[in-house]
């Protein structure tokens, strides 16, 4: 089980348990979707990573979610490569900056476009310790750097634990610092307990990556 799948599952559960945070902003409309969908950034050849739509994350057990991410990632990359090829061929049709800004403004006001990114977008960059991302098309972006062993204080004594730093950037029209803190607190609680480990059968757990880790940030 990848750490990416663990984070997606934890974030989906956290949003479902805090419905006041589960909102989409489309133009002047603030909407509350019936299900928690999450957009996962998938690295590809362009600077702007394509987003994999993961529907009803709270309703999918960890192993099923991990399998879906692994199965669909190549498909998302292939589709993005085809889209980039079309843009390189036909992008000259919208050459001027003001016209491109107009197109983007119309897109960001579209509920259908907003749903492409889910209620929350997640990006994971295991090559660095800390990563933060701007909000572009979604309500908030949750970012995680590498998971590594670090020394922390536990019960007044040093201990080695798997840790990761989470950074969350939210659209201030919908979220504020307190809401972001509430979401991160719930995600940390899920990650630091054995809640997700219980979703992995014993025979799978022996071969899987440990899913409980300490979080900071």
Q: What are the residue ranges of the model-derived segments?
A:
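C-terminal catalytic/motor cores of large multi-domain enzyme assemblies
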Residues: 1-217
């Amino acid at each position: 089980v990848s750490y990416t799948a663990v984070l997606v599952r934890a974030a989906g559960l956290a949003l479902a348990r805090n419905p006041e945070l589960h909102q989409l902003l489309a133009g002047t409309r603030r909407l509350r979707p019936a299900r928690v969908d999450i957009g996962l950034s998938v690295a590809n050849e362009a600077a702007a990573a394509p987003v994999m739509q993961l529907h009803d994350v709270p309703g999918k057990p960890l192993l099923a979610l991990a399998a879906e991410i692994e199965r669909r990632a190549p498909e998302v990359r292939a589709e993005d490569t085809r889209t980039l090829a079309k843009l390189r061929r036909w992008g000259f049709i919208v050459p001027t900056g003001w016209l491109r800004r107009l197109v983007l403004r119309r897109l960001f006001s579209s509920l259908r476009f907003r749903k492409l990114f889910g209620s929350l977008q997640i990006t994971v960059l295991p090559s660095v310790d800390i990563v933060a991302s701007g909000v572009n098309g979604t309500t908030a972006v949750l970012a995680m750097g590498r998971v590594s062993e670090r020394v922390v204080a536990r019960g007044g004594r040093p201990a080695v634990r798997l840790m990761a730093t989470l950074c969350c950037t939210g659209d201030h029209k919908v979220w504020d610092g307190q809401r972001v803190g509430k979401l991160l607190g719930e995600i940390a609680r899920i990650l630091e307990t054995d809640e997700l480990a219980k979703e992995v059968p014993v025979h799978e757990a022996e071969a899987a990556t440990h899913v409980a880790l300490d979080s900071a940030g």
